[in-house]
Amino acid sequence: MSELKQAAAPEQALVVGRITSVYGVKGWVKLYSHTEPMQGIFDYKHWWLKTPSGWKTVELSQGRLQGRGLVASVKGYTDRDQVKDICGMDVYIDAAELPELEEGDYYWSQLEGLRVITKEGVLLGKVSQLMETGANDVIVVRACEGSFDREERLIPYAPGTYVLNIDLEQQEMVVDWDPEF
């Protein structure tokens, strides 16, 4: 019998990964992690899963690096047929569980949704996501109501160079970026 328990939604639900598929025959699953480093997902023992019938919680039993990916065992799941039900689900934690950051450091989830404004005051859009590339992380800015145009922009996340200011209270990011580019 599985340990999928009905639960209230986390105060601030934050996706930290995804259960991608079954691994082996003893109830293990493969994981895709959004944490840095990727094994950081194992620091959170209680996971929330958003199911069609509401929020459920599961408890991480074990986790490890397997090849170039991650695998985990969830408490109460002992065979592959049981874990099939949770494959494809995002893994959430409560954002309150995240460690405190130093001033000027941000979690990507804090930046998603911020309005992006040039230093001249032109609204370019909102941060839809961030991407990891080889050199710099990149901010994906999508047009929103009131934005300069309907273009999507890719702006290097380079604080002090392109990113001039981030104000979480005002939900704004000021950038040094030509709106025509």
UniProtKB/Swiss-Prot annotation:
Binds ribosomal protein uS19. GO terms for cellular component: cytoplasm; ribosome. InterPro entries: PRC-brl_dom (IPR027275), PRC_barrel-like_sf (IPR011033), RimM (IPR011961), RimM_N (IPR002676), RimM_N_sf (IPR036976), Transl_B-barrel_sf (IPR009000). One of its GO terms (biological process) is rRNA processing. The gene is rimM. It comes from Marinomonas sp. (strain MWYL1). Keywords: Chaperone, Cytoplasm, Ribosome biogenesis, rRNA processing. Disulfide bonds: none annotated. The PRC barrel domain binds ribosomal protein uS19. This is Ribosome maturation factor RimM. GO terms for molecular function: ribosome binding. Pfam families: PRC, RimM. NCBIfam families: 16S_RimM (TIGR02273). Coiled coil: none annotated. Belongs to the RimM family. HAMAP family: Ribosome_mat_RimM (MF_00014). An accessory protein needed during the final step in the assembly of 30S ribosomal subunit, possibly for assembly of the head region. Essential for efficient processing of 16S rRNA. May be needed both before and after RbfA during the maturation of 16S rRNA. It has affinity for free ribosomal 30S subunits but not for 70S ribosomes. Residues 103-181 form the PRC barrel domain. Its main location: cytoplasm. It comes from the Bacteria. It is found in: Cytoplasm. The keyword rRNA processing applies.
